[in-house]
């Protein structure tokens, strides 16, 4: 047992905490003031990207505050947030299912009382009050303690059924089906267990996509992931120097239906594109780009049919100067990732701008890195996959003839752009072979 604090140590700790409280309170009051609201809104507007310097500074502040919280918070509360964490998830599910955000959006500026919300949504007033108390303390919904009225705030507004980001679909799918999948995590990490969490929970040997299709859930999955891609596209398009590619053709390896490629080509009208994917997926992509009713029909001349290529990127990749891969490699373990990277490296057309841009999470610690850790566990439990850290990406690149030129953070996106260029040693070896 540690020795008790001396009077001097206790006084020093008390003085430090009092000074910290004064500083945090003063900073909070400044951020709440009318003079700072416009500045703060630049970080939180959902219609444009935040200022990159301010976002980075705010992220550093959040990490520091969280580290400070970890030093001060009682251990039993930390544990409670984990074994009672289901409460927050399911309260948010309830709010989405009842369409509380839509109801409040149609109300006047004064907002609505719990009784009014309950009448409009068909809820028990007392139970709704309990759910809203949890959510408002997590900064979801605004609450006036004097009038006892609720309004939407910048967080809850993201869940409106017509919001362009469609985050409400994530609450529905991940708060229910994926929530159930997580039950399989404890058993899945045992050494004797071969199946991953999704297979254990649903008692199947099918992969997630096959099982979801059999259950009729696949449209919800595509709708959710598609909405997430749209929500993250502005940062992905803005925060990497895509202009360097000019009028060259980008081959999106594992590019699916072409949503990412389309967003890139619409922003850079000189660029051309192509997709390499499985035959069934390419058939679907052809309809999207080359049928008059397809959403990417306007890009048909820049994505000709011959650039929609059916194949297997574990075996061979067509020769191009520029490749991209978005949310593909986290499905695979390291041996397969090395095979894929080597296939692309072997086919790369040499040039001063030749590259492979990988759009994946950069697994990291700290409060602002938590989405990468959530993603890592989701990949583990649904696909036996993983997210990777910068160190892991650099090691994989070095072992497959590449080097990491730079990693670009991307605003409002869960991915970074990991810019791979052919390694100097590999290029030299090829010249002398």
Curated annotation (Swiss-Prot):
Binding residues annotated for S-adenosyl-L-methionine, in chain numbering: 277, 311-313
Coiled-coil region(s): 5-37
Keywords, comma-separated and alphabetical: Coiled coil, Methyltransferase, S-adenosyl-L-methionine, Transferase
Record-level GO BP terms: methylation; secondary metabolite biosynthetic process
SUPFAM superfamilies in alphabetical order: S-adenosyl-L-methionine-dependent methyltransferases, Winged helix' DNA-binding domain
Active site location: 330
E.C. designation(s): 2.1.1.-
Taxonomy, superkingdom: Eukaryota
MF terms in GO: O-methyltransferase activity; protein dimerization activity
Pfam families: Dimerisation, Methyltransf_2
Metabolic or biological pathway, per its Swiss-Prot or TrEMBL entry: Mycotoxin biosynthesis
Family: Belongs to the class I-like SAM-binding methyltransferase superfamily. Cation-independent O-methyltransferase family. COMT subfamily.
Function according to Swiss-Prot or TrEMBL: O-methyltransferase; part of the gene cluster that mediates the biosynthesis of aspirochlorine (or antibiotic A30641), an unusual halogenated spiro compound with distinctive antifungal properties due to selective inhibition of protein biosynthesis, and which is also active against bacteria, viruses, and murine tumor cells. The non-ribosomal peptide synthetase (NRPS) aclP is responsible the formation of the diketopiperazine (DKP) core from the condensation of 2 phenylalanine residues.
Protein name: O-methyltransferase aclM
Naturally occurring in which organism (per UniProt): Aspergillus oryzae (strain ATCC 42149 / RIB 40)
């Amino acid at each position: 047992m540690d020795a008790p604090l001396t009077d001097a140590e206790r006084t020093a700790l008390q003085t430090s905490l009092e000074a910290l409280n004064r500083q945090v309170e003063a900073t909070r009051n400044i951020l709440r003031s009318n003079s700072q609201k416009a500045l703060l809104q630049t970080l939180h507007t959902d219609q444009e990207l935040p200022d990159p310097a301010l976002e980075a500074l705010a992220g550093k502040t959040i990490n520091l505050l969280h580290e400070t919280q970890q030093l001060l918070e009682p251990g039993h509360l930390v544990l409670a947030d984990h074994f009672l964490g289901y409460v927050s998830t399911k309260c948010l599910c309830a709010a989405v299912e009842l369409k509380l955000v839509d109801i409040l959006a149609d109300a006047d500026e004064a907002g609505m009382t719990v009784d009014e919300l309950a009448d409009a949504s068909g809820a028990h007033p007392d139970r709704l009050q309990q759910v809203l108390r949890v959510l408002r303390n997590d900064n979801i919904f605004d609450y006036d303690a004097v009038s006892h009225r609720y309004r939407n705030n910048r967080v809850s507004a993201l869940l409106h059924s017509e919001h362009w980001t469609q985050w409400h679909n994530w609450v529905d799918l991940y708060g229910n089906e994926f929530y159930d999948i997580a039950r399989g995590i404890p058993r899945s990490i045992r050494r004797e267990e071969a199946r991953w969490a999704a297979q254990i929970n649903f008692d199947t040997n099918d992969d997630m996509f096959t099982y979801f299709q059999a259950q009729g859930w696949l449209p919800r999955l595509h709708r959710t992931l598609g909405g997430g891609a749209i929500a993250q596209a502005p940062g992905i398009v803005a925060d990497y120097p895509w202009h360097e590619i000019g009028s060259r053709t980008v081959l999106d390896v594992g590019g699916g239906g072409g949503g990412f490629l389309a967003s890139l080509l619409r922003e850079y009208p000189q660029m051309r594109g192509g997709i390499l994917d499985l035959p069934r997926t390419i058939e679907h992509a052809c309809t999207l780009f080359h049928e008059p009713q397809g959403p990417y029909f306007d890009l048909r001349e820049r994505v000709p049919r011959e650039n929609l290529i059916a194949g297997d990127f574990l075996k061979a990749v067509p020769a191009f100067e520029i490749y991209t891969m978005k949310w593909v490699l986290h499905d695979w373990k390291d041996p397969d990732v090395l095979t894929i990277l080597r296939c692309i490296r072997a086919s790369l057309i040499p040039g001063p701008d030749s590259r492979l841009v990988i759009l994946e999470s950069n697994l990291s610690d700290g409060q602002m890195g938590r989405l990468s850790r959530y993603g890592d566990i989701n990949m583990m439990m649904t696909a036996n996959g993983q997210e990777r850290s910068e160190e892991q990406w650099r090691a994989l690149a070095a072992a497959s003839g590449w080097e990491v030129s730079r990693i670009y953070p991307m605003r409002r996106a869960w991915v970074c752009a990991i810019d791979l260029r052919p390694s100097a040693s590999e290029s030299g070896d090829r010249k002398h072979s």
